[in-house]
């Protein structure tokens, strides 16, 4: 039995439990608060490479009001914690994608938007196309479509929020 468990078994804490208060370990509480805060304030950075970027801009417009979900687009990778890769990733652009990903602060998440970013799309058999951005950076959410609608990207962002709330494990990457 650890020190924290001994404190929680104390008669003083038992009185709080009897009155209906939730008594938990401090580390569990901190972890819950961090998950809630991370999921409620996603700051995506756009990495638009092709026509999917137009739909990404459409999602950021006032019709969908991403601010109510705590989602605010940032231009700098140092201020963002989510990168949305939208469009065809070429071999020449892959090192730049990795460099931008490395500049993001931890924890960082990646959303792959559209068929081209997911697996090469229409240009899959071209010699100069990377067959999925997951070969360069780890991807958390895949949004299918060519191009995916603004609603599909919004659903992907909400799925990322749920993923962060469900499990905080695996969100810190090197």
Swiss-Prot record:
NDH-1 is composed of 14 different subunits. Subunits NuoB, C, D, E, F, and G constitute the peripheral sector of the complex. GO terms for biological process: aerobic respiration; electron transport coupled proton transport. One of its GO terms (cellular component) is respiratory chain complex I. Coiled coil: none annotated. Pfam families: Oxidored_q6. It comes from Anaplasma phagocytophilum (strain HZ). This is NADH-quinone oxidoreductase subunit B. It is found in: Cell inner membrane. Belongs to the complex I 20 kDa subunit family. Keywords: 4Fe-4S, Cell inner membrane, Cell membrane, Iron, Iron-sulfur, Membrane, Metal-binding, NAD, Quinone, Translocase, Transport, Ubiquinone. It catalyses: a quinone + NADH + 5 H(+)(in) = a quinol + NAD(+) + 4 H(+)(out).
């Amino acid at each position: 039995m650890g020190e924290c468990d001994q404190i929680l078994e104390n008669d003083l804490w038992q009185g709080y439990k009897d009155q209906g208060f939730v008594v938990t370990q401090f580390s569990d509480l901190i972890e819950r608060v961090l998950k809630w805060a991370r999921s409620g304030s996603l700051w995506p950075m756009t990495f638009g490479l092709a026509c999917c970027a137009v739909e990404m801009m459409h999602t950021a417009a006032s019709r969908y009001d991403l601010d109510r979900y705590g989602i605010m687009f940032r231009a700098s990778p140092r201020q963002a914690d989510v990168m949305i890769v939208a469009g065809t990733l070429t071999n020449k652009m892959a090192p730049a994608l990795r460099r931008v990903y490395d500049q993001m602060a931890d924890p960082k998440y990646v959303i792959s938007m559209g068929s081209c970013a997911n697996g090469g799309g229409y240009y899959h058999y071209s010699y100069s196309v990377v067959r999925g951005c997951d070969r360069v950076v780890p991807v958390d959410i895949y949004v299918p479509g060519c191009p995916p609608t603004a609603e599909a990207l919004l659903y992907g962002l909400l799925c990322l929020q749920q993923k962060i709330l469900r499990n905080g494990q695996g969100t810190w990457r090197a």
